[in-house]
């Protein structure tokens, strides 16, 4: 059975989800039948076709009134600000991928279900009272049929959690700190402009900008045992895509650099194949653009101090990798069945 999907919010993640669907070979399993986005159809089609980070979309894109043609596929377009106006029941929607960045509460998920959707997947952490938070590759096996309102966590959580998981299983993590070196985002101004966060008043292309992050809380949501054992900070840098994460952990077992890198290499070709990758090439951020993995560890940057303090550099395409995980989690949700 093909899963009938609607995308609510067709910004950076929404568009990348659709592009990833067409590039990943999952179209026999997932069909996007509707998109809800306030922008007009011409703008939707243009930004789907032409992308400053990911280049031109290979499929033909046409607009016929409020039908978006992607190759031979016709996708209904809606422009509603209120979930209550969306015809999910009429369209037989199995899963809504809410990529708006606006909605994320249980009430928001219930609103989609009230309109006829069977399940909802949010593209950000959402509130703590959702049915489940999934980091694909780590805990998707915990999904149950009754989990109707689910979060796909965040791009940085998807990046770091698999690495934490493998290191904890192998070496026993005691505590850790995380520094996210994140590409600029569209909540930052091109030139200085007002914002309640005074650092975010500053031009995105001119500075390295510290911002708040809830990544430590995201780690705890997946691994409750690490409550008060991880801290995180984040800075935005003047690039438009790809993020690096500096992960430092203290571990119980004595280790060296070779131990750490062997673990990651083995995991990348085994339990975390397709989720984690490993490289020792002299690469820079742009080389990871359009990489579908959740995390790519640069083994040349692994450090160990005093046998118990590990530092690793982990890359991710914060758009493309996460968009691919949205598709994976959609399939995992559908595999549990629909009520």
Curated annotation (Swiss-Prot):
The name this protein goes by in its record: D-erythrose-4-phosphate dehydrogenase
SUPFAM superfamilies attached to this UniProt entry: Glyceraldehyde-3-phosphate dehydrogenase-like, C-terminal domain, NAD(P)-binding Rossmann-fold domains
Segment forming the signal sequence: none
SMART domains: Gp_dh_N
Listed EC numbers: 1.2.1.72
Self-association and partners: Homotetramer.
Species for this entry: Proteus mirabilis (strain HI4320)
Keywords linked to the UniProt accession: Cytoplasm, NAD, Oxidoreductase, Pyridoxine biosynthesis
Domain of life from the UniProt record: Bacteria
Active-site residue list: 155 (nucleophile)
